[in-house]
Curated annotation (Swiss-Prot):
Entry EC number(s): 2.7.11.-, 2.7.4.-
Family: Belongs to the HPrK/P family.
Function noted in UniProt: Catalyzes the ATP- as well as the pyrophosphate-dependent phosphorylation of a specific serine residue in HPr, a phosphocarrier protein of the phosphoenolpyruvate-dependent sugar phosphotransferase system (PTS). HprK/P also catalyzes the pyrophosphate-producing, inorganic phosphate-dependent dephosphorylation (phosphorolysis) of seryl-phosphorylated HPr (P-Ser-HPr).
UniProt name for this protein: HPr kinase/phosphorylase
Region (Important for the catalytic mechanism of both phosphorylation and dephosphorylation): 209-218
Chain intervals for the UniProt region annotation (Important for the catalytic mechanism of dephosphorylation): 273-278
Catalyzed reaction equations: [HPr protein]-L-serine + ATP = [HPr protein]-O-phospho-L-serine + ADP + H(+); [HPr protein]-O-phospho-L-serine + phosphate + H(+) = [HPr protein]-L-serine + diphosphate
Amino acid sequence: MKPTVVSADVLFEDHRAALKWQWVAGLGASERRFDEVAVRAARSGADLVGYLNYIHPYRVQILGEREVAYLTNESPDDCARRISRIITLEPPVLVVADDQTAPDTLLSMCERAQLPMFATPESAAFVIDVLRAYLSKHFADRTSMHGVFMDILGMGVMITGESGLGKSELGLELISRGHGLVADDAVDLYRINQTTIEGRCPELLQNLLEVRGIGLLDIKAIFGETAVRRKMRLKMIVHLVRRETLERDYERIPYEPLTQDVLGIPVRKVIIQVEAGRNIAVLVEAAVRNAILQLRGINTYQEFVERHRKAMEQDD
């Protein structure tokens, strides 16, 4: 699901301190919003802000030093025509950056059309960077997943599985081994670009881990600040299964790496059987270390296949 609403006043207030901007025109249009069709069509929120562009009117239009010069360094009629064209396109917001002074014609036209315009002393490039990051998160495709989301060796790992298999207990064991908790039970996932999924904890569950028989644990209070993380990028899913499920549904040694689709992005997946006597925390750490090696181009399974092939050739 992708949200489609952000109003001019919310955009202004959320960045009043960071961008030091002022609302200079169109104060009566505080509820003006992005075009919903444009938001749904955008590949990411980053597409919704940029320098002055007549081809993409749905963007937040940024007017830096060059753009203001383009609008003012011609005859009065030409300048008025160029400014009028911007107003006709009805962008959600105009931002005059680089400590430039908005032309009087632009101010008056924005006021008549009730088009919100902000002015900031910050550089146009900085404004674009800040707004792209904000809009990418705000308009990101999102979903929730049940599990325990951890930072294990610097990799964002989601622990999933059937109810009663000890996901939270496993999370507690990993925390005691020096890894970090992002979220337990409900994990909010955001697709922030074409290849990246970011996981966060709902504010209500921040720093909390539920363990059966003990109840809710405040991980930050018990283990300290370094035991929790605010967010992580999802790189791997560890799925816990019972023995009968593993034998029925999965290969013992899959030839191709398993993946799971999350918001349209394939995420590496590892299946671990839960059984009495198995140290699942050690197995999860080993799986993560192996994944890190694979990301570096070291594939143990392929190396084994190559050794086996060479051994067979020698026997022949």
